[in-house]
């Protein structure tokens, strides 16, 4: 039986990755500061450990693993990343985790390790036009990320690639673009735009009002979590290092995203634009390289992903006692 370890297995993407590896027949160890919030872990062994401590990293890397997935990081959506209040923690905590995990894997002579970077490492100056952002993998330099989160991701990419060159490690680097889906954070201040808008619309009665940061014309692409997991595993099993974008090319404005969710929810709410942290004006995955190197790209539409995500968040909102009264019968009947 093959063995894998998933660091960050208590998080959104990590918990889904554990499930996928288990379906393939792997024995899986999950590691995180916490268990998954919304469902029991599928891991065979789950270790609560702070990977900022090198002793803990050596403890969890206590045997040969066929695949190591390093997704653990201090991160969140725009409300966490772009306020400036969390910059020191973001850089310090995530950098320590990556330094420690690479050293632990190197000492154990584990060769194959996957690192989840982010599209936030792309230069801000290439993403000022909401209709024509540039995120080709070779556009990363000259470097100019729009946040300390992006700078840390860029540093850690180089760290993994350096360990690959100098220590013969078979590293894989993916740049994630706005992953969403069920069992993701939806209300703790770290949620990303799809979850935040699903929550706001679920909480608001028909004809009510929600807030959107900025003018809503800023653009993004969003990738459903199952496709993210599939792309990550495919990259891990390939003979190519990356870095490569794992994201959707279906770009949408935040206003249009809200409209799409309203359609799925079967309600109309008004939008009030307010000041708030925004990030770049436009971002979209460029999938030319992943098509060339892996012969694969995500195929699920944003609408289909949201159609699976909104009902899950609606149920969470109802169970938390935050939904308007008319939402409860709809959730019970599945409409």
Task: Go through each PLM region and give its residues.
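Conserved Rossmann-fold NAD(P)-dependent oxidoreductase catalytic core, especially the SDR/UDP-sugar
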Residues: 99-146
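Active-site helix of classical SDR
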Residues: 148, 152
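Rossmann-fold cofactor-recognition segment
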Residues: 41-54
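Conserved glycine-rich Rossmann-like NAD(P)H-binding loop of the short-chain dehydrogenase/reductase
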Residues: 26-35
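NAD(P)-dependent short-chain dehydrogenase/reductase
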Residues: 125-134, 158-236, 249-251, 259-265
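NAD(P)H-binding glycine-rich loop region in Rossmannoid oxidoreductase-like domains
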Residues: 51-94, 107, 124
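C-terminal substrate-binding subdomain of Rossmann-fold SDR/epimerase-dehydratase oxidoreductases
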Residues: 20, 203-335
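N-terminal Rossmann NAD(P)H-binding glycine-rich loop of SDR-like oxidoreductase domains
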Residues: 4-24
